[in-house]
UniProtKB/Swiss-Prot annotation:
It comes from Arabidopsis thaliana. The gene is SBP2. Disruption phenotype: Impaired fusion of polar nuclei. This is Selenium-binding protein 2. Disulfide bonds: none annotated. Pfam families: SBP56 (PF05694). InterPro entries: Se-bd. The keyword Iron does not apply.
Length: 487
């Protein structure tokens, strides 16, 4: 169903050449850390799956403490259709193009995970009020590549964009792979070579210095789109593998089976320093942080570096509750990583200066199924039950659990939303279907470590004009530690 949205007029890509002009982003991760403080955040907000017959939208949130509209939504760009399930976002150009003076970080790449559309959003003309530039239709994508369910996008130094797609149009995982778009969002081809598609799709990260791209595994869209069923894991409808590709050729070199220690490996990040051949992946269901690294023979291996133990619980659907690590990120100086436990409700900070041995330096509970007042209780080793204290902000209780996170360039502010995916939200946290999502800010101690909830920042998507909405991924206009790749 269409709603009215005016498409922005195509604008020049600013293709001026010159020795004094550089491309988008920053020359190095440490240069990015010294960049300006964030003033705006773009957030995917959706009504898909909520029962409200409204289009999803891109919310612009004011995060400038000196602004009179601080901690509020100042603009909403509604999509022209209903039912997209906006999810993750990326850029048409980022720090991987820093050496190209003609490149311009102008368009936010906004896939609809369920509809299969990909929107190009102009954020340059008016950063506070983005506009719709172009729509890539799912029919064209399917006809030219056989791909559907677009998820993660990354810009390439060539000017093209690469988008992971999680299945074919019928929702089968076997049809998943990688979509290549040109600089004006025209469908070029599949990136992966014929016969080299991954077992399952989700996230990916590339590192040109090691001629490698690694992708992760969620599950078959026909399974996860209906909610989570543990039997589907046993039935082979969810993944536990990392796929190692030759970059940029698109040939699969190796598949790493993480086994039961790596069920549902979702987000993946290399260290930001492009000379480092290591990084991490967060395994959601197993609730492990897994380090991957390159061997001397050019193969790749892995090891579990953090295990979040499941908690014994009462009154829940299972006798034990996993943490469910659904997102993590790495600070730009590669000193810390942060991850969330969506079900337990905590966010953790670890020092990773020794990548093999992360050290817990901060932890805070900001929601979860086990907060005080919940019908669910954790059971200690002594048999006594307990629940976690979760603070209120501005008189409002924190709902659901921390889900997507975004870190300021200087590493001192961590933002968190609480919606994972509408079908899973409804299953695990039905409250946010009626009360909506929120964004919180956590102040970070980058000297000694530590996390503190900021009492002055709270964006309540329960108060949106068209009704409570679900908020997911966040992006800054100038790039961030999960969008930009240095080469």
């Amino acid at each position: 169903m269409a709603t009215e949205t005016v498409l922005a007029t195509a604008v020049s890509n600013g293709k001026s050449k010159g020795c004094c002009k550089s491309g988008p982003g920053y020359a190095t991760p440490l240069a990015a850390m010294a960049g300006p403080r964030e003033k705006l955040i773009y957030v995917t907000a959706l009504y898909s799956g909520t029962g409200r017959d409204k289009p999803d939208y891109l919310a612009t949130v004011d995060v400038d403490p000196s602004s009179p509209t601080f901690s509020s939504v100042i603009h909403r760009l509604k999509m022209p259709y209903i039912g997209d399930e906006l999810h993750h976002t990326g850029w048409n150009s980022c720090s991987s193009c820093h050496g190209d003076a003609s490149a311009d970080r102008r368009y936010l790449v906004l896939p609809g995970l369920i509809s299969g559309r990909i929107y190009a959003i102009d954020t340059k003309t008016d950063p506070k009020a983005p506009s719709l530039y172009k729509v890539v239709e799912p029919k064209e994508i399917a006809e030219k590549t056989g791909l559907a369910f677009p998820h993660t996008s990354h810009c390439l130094a060539s000017g093209d964009m690469l988008v992971s797609c999680l299945g074919d149009k019928e929702g089968n995982a076997k049809g998943n792979g990688f979509l290549l778009l040109d600089s004006d969002f025209n469908v070029k081809s599949r990136w992966d070579k014929p016969g080299h598609g991954p077992l399952f799709g989700y996230d990916f990260w590339y590192q040109p210095r090691f001629k490698t791209m690694i992708s992760t595994s969620w599950g078959a869209p026909k399974a996860f789109s209906k909610g989570f069923n543990l039997q589907h894991v046993a039935d082979g409808l969810y993944g536990s593998h990392l796929h190692i590709y030759q970059w940029p050729e698109g040939e699969m070199k190796q598949i790493i089976d993480l086994g039961n220690t790596g069920l549902l490996p979702l987000e993946i990040r290399f260290l930001h320093d492009p000379s480092k051949d290591t990084g991490y992946v967060g395994s959601a269901l197993s609730s492990n942080m897994i380090r991957f690294f390159k061997n001397s023979d050019d193969t790749w291996s892995h090891e579990v570096v953090i295990s979040v133990k499941p908690l014994k619980v009462e009154n829940w659907i299972l006798p034990e509750m996993p943490g469910l690590i659904t997102d993590f990120l790495i600070s730009l100086d590669d000193r810390f990583f942060y991850f969330v436990n969506w079900l337990h409700g905590d966010i953790r900070q670890y020092n990773i200066e020794d990548p093999k041995n992360p050290v817990l330096t901060g932890q805070i509970w900001v929601g979860g199924l086990l907060q005080k007042g919940s019908p669910y209780k954790a059971v200690g080793e002594d048999g006594n039950t307990y629940q976690f204290d979760v603070p209120q902000i501005k008189g409002k209780s924190l709902r659901a659990g921390p889900q997507m996170i975004q870190l300021s360039l200087d590493g001192k502010r961590l933002y968190a939303t609480n919606s994972l995916f509408s079908a899973w939200d409804r299953q695990f946290y039905p409250e946010i279907m009626e009360k909506g999502s929120h964004i919180i800010q956590i102040d970070v101690d980058t000297d000694k470590g530590g996390l503190t909830l900021n009492p002055d920042f709270f964006v309540d998507f329960g108060d949106e004009p068209d009704g409570p909405a679900l908020a997911h991924e966040m992006r800054y206009p100038g790039g961030d530690c999960t969008s930009d790749i240095w080469i």
